Every structure is written in C-alpha cells, then in structure tokens.
Amino acid sequence: ASDVYKRQPADCVKIAKHHILKNRNIDLIASGINHGSNSSISVLYSGTMSAAIEGAIENTPAIGFSLCDFDPNAYLDHTKEYVKKIVKNALENGIPDSIALNVNIPAISSEKIKGIKLCRQANAIWEETFDKRHDPYGREYYWMVGNFVNHDKGKDNDEWAIKNNYVSIVPCKFDLSSKRGLSFLNDNWKI
C-alpha cells in the first residue's frame, strides 16, 4: 500500500490485518529486527513483540526478531541466515494457535553462533536507577539506567542460550495469568 501509518507496532498489525490486507490471508507476521535484546523480562517492554503477540491473538502465525545489539548501525547481515531458517520452519511446520515466537540473535559473527535453541523465558529483572539530567534548554528529565540481573541458573532459558552463542526461540502467549496467584487469592482473600 502507498499509505504510511505511524502508530505503535501492535496498532500497525491491526491496521494491516483489518484495513490494508482485510481481504487477504496472512501467512506470517514478522516483526523486527529490533535493535537490542527482547529476552527475559524485556519482552514485556517490547514493541517488536507486541506486534507479534497481536498477530498471535488473532491466530496469525507471528515471530518477533531481535538482534542483541543496541547500536542503530549494528551489523545485520548475519541475521539473514537465521531469519530465513526460522521463517521457513514456521511456514512449513506451523506455529500453535495463539503463540508468537520471540527470537533473539546474538551480536556475534555467524561463524561463532552455535545453533538455535528452543527454550523458555529466563527469570531475570532490571535493577533500575535513574539519572537526573538536563536537556539543552535546562529542562529536567530522567534517564533510566541499571543492571540486568539473571536469577535463572538453568540452561534451558533464553538468557543462557544467548550468553552461550545460540539464537534463542521462546514460544510466548498473551495470557499472563498466574494459576498459582489465582489459587492463593481464592484460598486466602475474603472478597
């Protein structure tokens, strides 16, 4: 389409699916390549993954791709091999309904990547601090900084995979409900 839409990534998927491509079958939504990791807790803040999840909500196969490099001029050529392989598998073998794949590609040369790992999301957090700064006009703003802390010591998660030079694939779903939390509330709250 010749129209340009400037919206949030999930909104772009909705506009494409229900307006631009409304009479067409969509084989796959590929979102990204994001500059920076969307592994572990970072998936919650990700526009790239929100677009993929939006597709999955409507049972359209969807994948969010991220390169673990925040440099806007990052070298992307080595990602082609993995994007092609993953997309080919998704088209030929499918993705379960309501599931989006979260793919993170290490920022290393193709020769150093050991392969692809299917894994789960790591249990990690950001311990944030905020720097108070001033823009050129003297206005205050805050810049979030902090340390990424991986509490997950398993070898079956995305953080381990990326750290050990693997491309990680985590199947993600929209439902963030906690069965354990719901059970606790049902047993202990008097509402």
Where are these regions (language model features)?
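Short, small-residue-biased leader/transition segments that mark boundaries at the very start
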Residues: A1-Y5
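A charged, well-structured terminal subsegment
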Residues: K84-K112
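C-terminal accessory domains and tails appended to enzymatic cores
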Residues: P96, P106-I191
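Glycine-rich phosphate-binding loop signature in dinucleotide/nucleotide-binding domains
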Residues: I20-I26
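Glycine/threonine-rich flexible loop motifs
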Residues: S37-S46
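Short, glycine-/small-residue-rich phosphate/pyrophosphate-handling segment
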Residues: I63-A90
